[in-house]
């Protein structure tokens, strides 16, 4: 951005207290850690850029962490990084940056912006448009994603040529607020119950005992029972405290319902496009009906482990995001036809 002639101010987020990293063992690289703050200061100093450290620990706790805990209490599998982009990075932080008199916000995310639309990055393996699809449409005009035209190796080589010390730094992998990656321990500390119950198959046969429904997600294979065939989590019955498992073929579905919608393009009643339901899943051709603030999605081929709480992003044929939302349930439950 400096090469293009912009006056640059750097901003660095602190989402959790530094003390957390002193009490928890860091299993993998996470963002927003004390080492990241050190690196941000060093890079800003190298290029003579003012660095502002923005503390959002309280609002992060009240929004992202509470959402994460509450979703598990509901038996769902949340996606905190998706909502962090909307509520924190391009919410609280964006507002602060604009209030400070800046015109644009440039971030290192891998995505493209063209003609007011959010597109997948040139480097499809590192593409982050899936997580960025939560950003409100009216905010896209403030954003710049310089990395979107490059792949990761090209960015690392540019950083190396500029003698930036973090050119070979590993990517962030785990949640910043659970640096030891012990999700079970974190949830237990925060009041999520883990009441044991029965594991059954679709015919009602008892196969074993589960360790609390919040400990499992749809499609999970390692469920701690000895059976001849591989079994996968199909659903969680919270009323009866039952974990229902089945064969792999039973985990696939081609219809599901999506709510809490964020539109990045004008949409009418019907959409033809491609849907992605997990970051590492491929997009699947689909048709979508919009009705009463919900999407009713039907895919051309069945998708493995459609999981309530996870995110569905619909793309057009050019790779631009049309709409995103939260997966509520498999099936359509009352909505039966596109006609």
Curated annotation (Swiss-Prot):
Keyword Ion transport among record annotations: no
GO process annotations (BP): tRNA wobble position uridine thiolation
SUPFAM superfamilies membership: Adenine nucleotide alpha hydrolases-like
Signal peptide: none
Localization (cell): Cytoplasm
Major location (coarse): cytoplasm
Pfam families: tRNA_Me_trans, tRNA_Me_trans_C, tRNA_Me_trans_M
Keywords on record: ATP-binding, Cytoplasm, Disulfide bond, Nucleotide-binding, RNA-binding, Transferase, tRNA processing, tRNA-binding
Gene Ontology CC annotations of this record: cytoplasm
Keyword Disulfide bond attributed: yes
Swiss-Prot/TrEMBL site (Interaction with tRNA) positions: 109, 310
Catalytic activity: S-sulfanyl-L-cysteinyl-[protein] + uridine(34) in tRNA + AH2 + ATP = 2-thiouridine(34) in tRNA + L-cysteinyl-[protein] + A + AMP + diphosphate + H(+)
Listed EC numbers: 2.8.1.13
Binding annotation for ATP: 13, 108
Molecular function GO terms recorded: ATP binding; tRNA binding; tRNA-uridine 2-sulfurtransferase activity
Region (Interaction with tRNA) location: 126-128
Active-site residues, as the UniProt record annotates them: 84 (nucleophile), 176 (cysteine persulfide intermediate)
Classification via InterPro entries: MnmA-like, MnmA-like_C, MnmA-like_central, MnmA-like_central_sf, Rossmann-like_a/b/a_fold
S-S pairs: 84-176
Protein function: Catalyzes the 2-thiolation of uridine at the wobble position (U34) of tRNA, leading to the formation of s(2)U34.
Similarity remark: Belongs to the MnmA/TRMU family.
PANTHER family, per database record: MITOCHONDRIAL TRNA-SPECIFIC 2-THIOURIDYLASE 1, TRNA 5-METHYLAMINOMETHYL-2-THIOURIDYLATE -METHYLTRANSFERASE
Protein name as annotated: tRNA-specific 2-thiouridylase MnmA
């Amino acid at each position: 951005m400096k090469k293009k002639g912009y006056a640059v101010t750097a901003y660095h987020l602190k989402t959790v207290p530094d003390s957390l990293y002193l009490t928890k063992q860091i299993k993998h690289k996470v963002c927003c850690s004390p080492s990241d703050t050190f690196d941000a200061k060093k890079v800003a100093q190298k290029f003579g850029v003012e660095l502002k450290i923005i503390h959002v620990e309280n609002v992060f706790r009240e929004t992202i962490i509470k959402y994460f805990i509450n979703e598990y209490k509901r038996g769902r599998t949340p996606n905190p990084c998706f909502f962090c982009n909307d509520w924190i990075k391009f919410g609280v932080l964006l507002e602060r940056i604009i209030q400070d008199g800046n015109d644009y916000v440039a971030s290192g995310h891998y995505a493209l912006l063209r003609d007011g639309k959010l597109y997948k990055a040139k480097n499809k393996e590192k593409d982050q448009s899936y997580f960025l699809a939560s950003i409100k449409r009216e905010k896209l005009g403030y954003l710049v994603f310089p990395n979107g035209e490059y792949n990761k190796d090209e960015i690392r080589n540019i950083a190396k040529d500029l003698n930036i010390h973090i050119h070979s730094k590993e990517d962030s992998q785990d949640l910043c607020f659970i640096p030891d990656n012990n999700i079970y321990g974190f949830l237990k500390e925060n009041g999520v119950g883990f009441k044991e119950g029965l594991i059954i198959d679709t015919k009602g046969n008892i196969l074993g005992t589960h360790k609390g429904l919040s400990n499992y997600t749809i499609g999970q294979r390692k469920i701690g029972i000895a059976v001849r065939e591989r079994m996968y989590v199909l659903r969680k019955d919270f009323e009866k405290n039952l974990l229902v498992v089945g064969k792999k073929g039973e985990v696939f579905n081609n219809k599901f319902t999506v709510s809490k919608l964020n539109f990045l393009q004008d949409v009418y009643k019907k959409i033809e496009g491609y849907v992605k339901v997990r970051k590492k899943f491929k997009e699947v051709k689909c048709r979508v009906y919009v009705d009463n603030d919900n999407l009713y999605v039907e895919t051309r081929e069945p998708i493995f482990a459609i999981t309530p709480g996870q995110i569905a992003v619909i793309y057009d044929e050019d790779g631009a995001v049309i709409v995103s939302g939260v997966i509520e349930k498999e099936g359509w439950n009352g909505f039966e036809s596109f006609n």
